[in-house]
């Protein structure tokens, strides 16, 4: 019976969570591992009543994602969760629910880098006052920097994308290998 390692990948919007997660999934599956990605944004969109980004809605979405992880854990070698997950107390609750074999990966990028890449135009919209609660950018909606994490990757320099992908994938691969042999 499998017991997936869970990799909770947190960081502000556009730090590279989805990019690194997608790369890791491909690499791991090429080595025979069974991998599930549970994207926080995808789960958020499945609610009948659309969730916002206030503390209550973020907590609800994070806890729902954690419950999905628990329900799917015995089917996979790794579950990777790209999610903003900006509230420290909620991350601590999720860690308790999903431990053992829970790993928090913190992706950091400086604001200048985030504004420069901004593929969805979120930072521009926040600067224009169109978005008033952009997590970690708007004063009304802070991003609590994790007090404890298992891996921190600075994704500020896009030229280091290959290095970031390698760090991310190597970390996950090493954690999978510590508890199991090749599938």
Each PLM stretch: what is its role?
Residues 1-4:
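Phosphate-binding P-loop
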Residues 6, 37, 102-106, 150-152:
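Conserved beta-strand scaffold positions in the cores of enzyme catalytic domains, especially
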Residues 9:
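Hydrophobic anchor at the beta1->P-loop junction of P-loop NTPases
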Residues 13:
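The conserved Walker
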Residues 17:
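Conserved lysine of the Walker
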Residues 21-67, 72:
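Conserved substrate/cofactor phosphate-moiety recognition/catalytic segment
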Residues 56-99, 104, 124:
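Glycine-rich phosphate-binding loop used to anchor ATP phosphates in small-molecule kinases
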Residues 108-111, 116-183:
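Small-molecule kinase domains that catalyze NTP-dependent phosphoryl transfer to phosphate-bearing small molecules
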């Amino acid at each position: 019976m499998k017991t997936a390692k869970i990799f909770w990948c947190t960081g502000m919007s556009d730090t590279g969570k989805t990019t690194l997660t997608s790369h890791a999934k491909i690499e791991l599956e090429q080595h025979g591992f069974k991998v599930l990605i549970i994207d926080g944004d995808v789960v958020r969109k499945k609610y009948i009543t659309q969730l916002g980004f206030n503390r209550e809605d973020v907590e609800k979405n994070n806890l729902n994602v954690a419950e999905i992880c628990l329900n799917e854990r015995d089917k996979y070698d790794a579950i990777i969760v790209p999610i903003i997950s900006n509230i420290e107390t909620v991350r601590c609750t999720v860690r308790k629910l999903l431990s053992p074999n829970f790993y928090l990966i913190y992706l950091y990028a400086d604001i200048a880098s985030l504004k420069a890449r901004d593929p969805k135009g979120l930072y521009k919209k926040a600067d224009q006052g169109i978005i008033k609660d952009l997590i970690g950018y708007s004063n009304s909606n802070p991003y609590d920097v994790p007090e404890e994490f298992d891996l921190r990757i600075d994704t500020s320099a896009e030229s280091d994308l290959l290095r970031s992908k390698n760090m991310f994938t190597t970390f996950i691969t090493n954690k999978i290998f510590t508890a199991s042999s090749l599938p």
